[in-house]
Amino acid sequence: MQSPPIKLLTQELLDEVAASSRRSPRQRQNYNFHELSEKVQRFVNVLQPGTYVRPHQHLRPPAVNGFEFFVVIQGELGMVIMNENGQILRSLRVSAAGPTRAVELPEGTIHTLVALAPDTVILEFKEGPYEVAADKDFLAGFPAEGTAAARELVLIWEAEFNS
């Protein structure tokens, strides 16, 4: 029986995913280390300033833990925690340079992400399997991706972290 391959997270891989994120209309790109059916999801997400991550939460069936664990391994990220009405409860600056380098969000935490530096890389872990239709519960009242309203909102959030 052949062993599964050893998977490496190299700077070359990060540079390739970053280049792809810069070409993407969404200004971000994932690279999965897992198969979608696996119990533990492991991936990097490279974000560029200007990307819009619609506020959302993760709700899972009772047998699955809906936590998310983020480690910023390159660049800097703003994380905005909200209540169900979209009011900001907390803003966190998470950076590869510290002092805060990682965050674990419990299931049901409504959040969005703001890239504060080019080629920001998040190493993320969460319980699977991944089901595209059920992965995110988007917060009502926030614009869809690709809209002018979404772009305006990103500018507001970026300004909050850069003031």
Locate the predicted segments by residue.
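Glycine- and acidic-residue-biased ligand/ion/polar-headgroup-sensing regions
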Residues: 66-84
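Short acidic-glycine-tyrosine-enriched beta hairpin
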Residues: 83-111
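A short, N-terminal "cap"/entry segment at the start of jelly-roll beta-barrel domains
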Residues: 1-44, 92-95, 156-163
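His/acidic/aromatic-lined binding-pocket segments of jelly-roll/cupin-type domains
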Residues: 43-45, 62-72, 103, 113-114
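Conserved short histidine dyad/triad with adjacent acidic residue
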Residues: 26-27, 45-64, 96
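Short beta-strand segments in beta-sandwich/barrel cores
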Residues: 43, 51-54, 75-81
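Double-stranded beta-helix
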Residues: 87, 112-163
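Short beta-strand His + acidic residue motifs that chelate non-heme Fe in jelly-roll/DSBH
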Residues: 55, 79-81, 103-105, 111-116, ...
